[in-house]
């Protein structure tokens, strides 16, 4: 569901992580995981003009319930031959992001005559969390996750982002990592070939910049 005048979007979907598609030596699961998920996004551009720069903020988030296709995993100790059974927990997976759009600020609120590079930036803070909620016998009931502050540069045909990955507790990790992303807009770069939709008619390109 989309409500353009109020800059609101709601979406329901299902995420599937297929089991048996990786090496077990590096921790790949033999079972699949199905996660029904609810997504939302809200821009603040519909606020009164008197709120000024606040209207360039946007909030997104998702909440899902992770369900393994197998309730437990059995393994055999190669030395003793003993069979151990480990439960596969169900998790609540959720996250959010808060971002500030410099392109929106310039085009819809006020042009501060900033350098062009700055006008393409979107500072962002993302957070992702996982909480065990069922079938977690014998394991700690601890929420894990990360908080990821960063920035995205948005162009007409691609965007580049970089974020720090900060664990929220020791169970989530002991060091700070870095995540980098390059996102190509194939529908704008190749609108008549690989950027075409499989079904239906392509919408006119919506380039944020000339």
Residue ranges and their predicted role:
Residues 1-96, 138-141, 190, 210:
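Outer-membrane pore/translocation modules
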Residues 85-209:
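Outer membrane beta-barrel transmembrane domains
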């Amino acid at each position: 569901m989309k409500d353009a005048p109020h800059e609101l979007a709601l979406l329901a979907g299902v995420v599937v992580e297929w089991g048996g598609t990786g090496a077990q030596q590096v921790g790949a699961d033999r079972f699949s995981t199905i996660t029904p998920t609810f997504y939302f996004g809200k821009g603040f551009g519909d606020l009164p003009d008197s709120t000024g720069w606040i209207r360039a903020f946007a909030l997104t988030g998702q909440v899902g319930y992770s369900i393994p296709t197998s309730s437990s995993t059995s393994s055999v100790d190669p030395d003793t031959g003993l069979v151990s059974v480990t439960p596969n927990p169900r998790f609540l997976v959720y996250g959010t992001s808060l971002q500030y759009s410099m392109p929106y600020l310039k085009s819809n609120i006020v042009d501060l005559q900033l350098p062009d590079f700055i006008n393409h930036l979107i500072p962002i803070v993302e957070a992702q969390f996982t909480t065990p909620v069922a079938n977690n016998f014998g394991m700690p009931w601890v929420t894990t996750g990360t908080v990821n502050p960063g920035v995205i540069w948005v162009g007409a045909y691609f965007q580049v982002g970089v974020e720090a990955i900060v664990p929220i507790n020791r169970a989530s990790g002991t060091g700070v990592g870095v995540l980098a992303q390059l996102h190509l807009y194939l529908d704008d770069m190749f609108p008549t070939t690989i950027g075409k939709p499989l079904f239906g008619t392509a919408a006119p390109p919506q380039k944020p910049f000339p």
